Amino acid sequence: MNQEFYNAVKESVQMSQQRWVEWRHEMTGLLHCGSCLSLHKCWFVFEKAPVSPLHEKCHCTTVAIPVSQVKNNAVAKSDYSKYNPYLFDPKNFYRHGKNKAFESWGYTVSDSEWLQKEIEKQGKLQYLLGNYELGALNMRGQRISIRVTIPRKNGTGEVSFITGWMVNPGGEIKLNTPYGGK
């Protein structure tokens, strides 16, 4: 059996066994929590959703949504600027040193478009499979960490690292950082 086909079947079965929920902020009262508002209509695997209630006066709920809705509508997005100039930082403006890791694996700024597409593809797949970890939550939203793997360009083997994302309503995840560490 073709390995790619086998992996696709395995992933489909894994996803069909998951329960997904949509976070709903109930608009009651005059005051609203910024964290709750930022989660409104965001989708999570039930077992990896933020704890509800978030606080003593929380009126939020989670509602089950069909796996098919998630599978058909989820999307991973990233801005090209997260790779060039941010990741490779050719002018040393950001001074984060993230470019050193990618350069040590054989990647250059000319690989930015490929990295963008590959990280989006893997980010979406891992999100759909529930392979993410919750990060910080505040009024800007819920962050998640997703591990991706790319081939080394300057040798054999692969390298795996953490990417950072923000969960947005309707099944969208948006890249915050293409490299959040090993």
Regions found by a protein language model. Name each.
Residues M1-K57, V63-Q126:
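Domain-core detector
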Residues Q17-T28, H32-G34, Q116-K182:
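Functional cores of ribonucleases/endoribonucleases
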